[in-house]
Amino acid sequence: MTNNLSGYRNKFVRVKTSKKRTVSSSNWLRRQLNDPYVAKARIDGFRSRAAYKLLEIHEKFKLFTPNMKIVDLGAAPGGWSQVASKLIKASDNNLNNKIISIDVLEIEHVAGVEFVQKDFFEADTEELIIQALDGRADIVMSDMASNTIGHKATDHIRTLLLCEQAFEFALKVLKPSGHFIAKIFRGGAENELLHKVKREFKTVKHFKPSSSRSESTEIYLVALNKK
């Protein structure tokens, strides 16, 4: 199982105080050093702990199969693209599988992944992606979140707006029966978006992977079978 952390739970690591480091930076560093999924990702060769979230989503919903076309929005540092590549058995020589990863930040090459360094909000991105896919996508996935400021309501709205834009993008590039996966933060304002998604997909589920930090309000919207 992807959430088997045997051997990854180490003794608690304390972070020494530093005048050059803010309290929030110290808290983030402490959390990273004591997070078993961070340690597991390092050993398993994944670029981020977020890889395990997508693995759990796949275990729950069985979304990925060989010979798929996938778009990964906001892909950096590439953890989700790595997982998708493994699950569909992508390789640089296999033309039946296509993964297009988009981000304004550069990511290192992943086998079977074509990286587009671009903001997906730009007007020409949709047509560019369709051309790169040579058709429509089976899955559009987004683990994007806005930079958090610690104010839950603001963080909720900002990430929800990203999800809405990813959803509108997905409607344009997904084939019928395609799937959409995206991160949202719970906060009350997501209901309107959920109604929109339910009108466009046959099945819509919420899922919180065990690899998602318990204190986080993040959940994943899993929309199956575009109408």
Swiss-Prot record:
Alphabetically ordered keywords of this record: Cytoplasm, Methyltransferase, rRNA processing, S-adenosyl-L-methionine, Transferase
InterPro entries assigned to the protein according to its UniProt record, in alphabetical order: RNA_methyltr_RlmE, RNA_MeTrfase_FtsJ_dom, rRNA-MeTfrase_E, SAM-dependent_MTases_sf
Compartments where found: Cytoplasm
Catalysed conversion reaction: uridine(2552) in 23S rRNA + S-adenosyl-L-methionine = 2'-O-methyluridine(2552) in 23S rRNA + S-adenosyl-L-homocysteine + H(+)
Region forming the signal peptide: none
Major location (coarse): cytoplasm
Active site: K183 (proton acceptor)
Record Pfam families: FtsJ
Residues that bind S-adenosyl-L-methionine: G78, W80, D103, D119, D143
Top-level lineage group: Bacteria
Molecular function via GO: rRNA (uridine-2'-O-)-methyltransferase activity
GO cellular component: cytoplasm
Enzymatic class: transferase
TM stretches of this protein: none
UniProt keyword annotation of S-adenosyl-L-methionine present: yes
Enzyme Commission code: 2.1.1.166
Family indicated by similarity: Belongs to the class I-like SAM-binding methyltransferase superfamily. RNA methyltransferase RlmE family.
Purpose of the protein: Specifically methylates the uridine in position 2552 of 23S rRNA at the 2'-O position of the ribose in the fully assembled 50S ribosomal subunit.
Protein name per Swiss-Prot or TrEMBL: Ribosomal RNA large subunit methyltransferase E
Organism: Rickettsia conorii (strain ATCC VR-613 / Malish 7)
